[in-house]
Amino acid sequence: MDLLELSEKKTMSREEAADLLRQLADSLARHNGVEFNHNGIKVQARVPDEVTVEVEFEAESDESSLEIEISW
């Protein structure tokens, strides 16, 4: 059973998506963690020095997706 799971999906420009990824990367590099704000809930997660990263690309005839998962 999950203690907490936050999920959000929204449409944005490619540039906005790149900015979001940069913000996450900067937070991981500088602050050793990430912070999420979702429906008035603020959650901070500490991230250890070593993590597992999974990158998955899927292309279909009508849609493609890129998933990046970081776990520890």
Q: How does the language model describe each region?
A:
Residues M1-D19, Q23-D26:
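Terminal, regulation- and interaction-focused segments at domain boundaries
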Residues M1-S7, E35-N37, I41-W72:
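N-terminal intrinsically disordered, cationic/polar leader segments
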Residues A17-A18, A25, A29, A45, ...:
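A sequence-composition feature that detects small, non-aromatic residues
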Residues Q23-R30, V34-N37, I41:
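Extracellular/virion structural assembly segments
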